[in-house]
Amino acid sequence: MATMLNKRVTGAFGKQAPVRSARVAAVRPSRSSVRVAATAAPQEVEGFKVMRDGIKVASDETLLTPRFYTTDFDEMERLFSLELNKNMDMEEFEAMLNEFKLDYNQRHFVRNETFKEAAEKIQGPTRKIFIEFLERSCTAEFSGFLLYKELGRRLKATNPVVAEIFTLMSRDEARHAGFLNKAMSDFNLALDLGFLTKNRKYTFFKPKFIFYATYLSEKIGYWRYISIYRHLQRNPDNQLYPLFEYFENWCQDENRHGDFFTAVLKARPEMVNDWAAKLWSRFFCLSVYITMYLNDHQRDAFYSSLGLNTTQFNQHVIIETNKSTERIFPAVPDVENPEFFRRMDLLVKYNAQLVNIGSMNLPSPIKAIMKAPILERMVAEVFQVFIMTPKESGSYDLDANKTALVY
């Protein structure tokens, strides 16, 4: 949930050398001086609220913003325990671990002097939407870092191979989040990721649902990044900022992470081989697709600044992600049915109406009354999309004792 779960910041504090005690005359500032110092700090930078100099207040959490995730770590330990799951096929995990250790992108995320210069040329409304894009992307990557890091720590004793893979994936996510946060500083802002860690709400998902959500997040992240990269290679005049030049190698991290979760689901076939799995697979696909579709159309100006058609871009990403997903999920939405995107476009229309009402200078109760019938129509459309005839899928033969790929 690439996109949505989470890429990284670490802090190291050196041990202080012993210092002899000394008597120092403490000077207590007057109340007036404290008041002056407090008001001297800017309350806004680039049109965004700041919590302190250069540090942006995180955007409000909504249904469409990136989330931080947590899970039942004890159940995770049981699912991957080699002692409890003696028949677990570790060959594919071991091969993946060796690939993660190669760290293909170790030297990829190196900035150059063009970043700051390019950021200074981006002005007006485009500048603000670039900052919003960087914040959402950084938050999503950092979310993944936090989850993967904790899984790596918790699984060390029960399954060292899988634990190390999670740790190495958290390494990737940390690089991505750090790179994006540094990009924000080109626009005179940054996120306090340590503050977010402690203060942001965490959404709980059972392990099975974590696997669904993170698989989709990583795969949709891959298709988003590679699609933007290829578009800008064909249209270099729209390359407003050098960040996008890194997307070709960057997206391979996302793809490898998604492939790891494919291996996880193959190792736990009970998660993808019954009627409940079919319903949950479709639910998570729709949740991810609808969230992206509404989010991106709400920020159409960003994609337009890159020369992209937001609708065409989103539909391409969803179709390609769905093709990848149907290889392992037992059922997926039929996104190539024209009715699917017709209803998605209706959701975009209704969401725009909600945003418009939200911006009105009216009392909250009045806004709630105005929003109610629109929300009702949105729920009805989502339900209609969910009950559309799905594509029965899953090209892997998932046997309880042996997993084999069907050609």
Swiss-Prot record:
Among the Pfam families in the record, one is Rubrerythrin
Any one Gene Ontology MF annotation carried by this entry is: magnesium-protoporphyrin IX monomethyl ester (oxidative) cyclase activity
Q: Does the keyword Plastid apply?
A: yes
Cofactor(s) essential for the protein = Fe cation
- GO cellular-component term (any): chloroplast
Provide the primary localization.
plastid
| Taxonomic superkingdom | Eukaryota
Q: Which UniProt keywords apply?
A: Chlorophyll biosynthesis, Chloroplast, Iron, Metal-binding, NADP, Oxidoreductase, Photosynthesis, Plastid, Transit peptide
EC main group: oxidoreductase
Q: What GO terms describe the biological role, i.e. biological process, of this protein?
A: chlorophyll biosynthetic process; photosynthesis
Q: What is its EC number?
A: 1.14.13.81
Which reaction(s) does the protein catalyse, per the Swiss-Prot or TrEMBL entry?
Mg-protoporphyrin IX 13-monomethyl ester + 3 NADPH + 3 O2 + 2 H(+) = 3,8-divinyl protochlorophyllide a + 3 NADP(+) + 5 H2O
| Keyword NADP belongs to the record | yes
The entry's family comment says: Belongs to the AcsF family.
* NCBIfam families, sorted: AcsF (TIGR02029), PRK13654.1 (NF010172)
* Name by which UniProt lists this protein: Magnesium-protoporphyrin IX monomethyl ester [oxidative] cyclase 2, chloroplastic
Q: Which organism is it from?
A: Chlamydomonas reinhardtii (Chlamydomonas smithii)
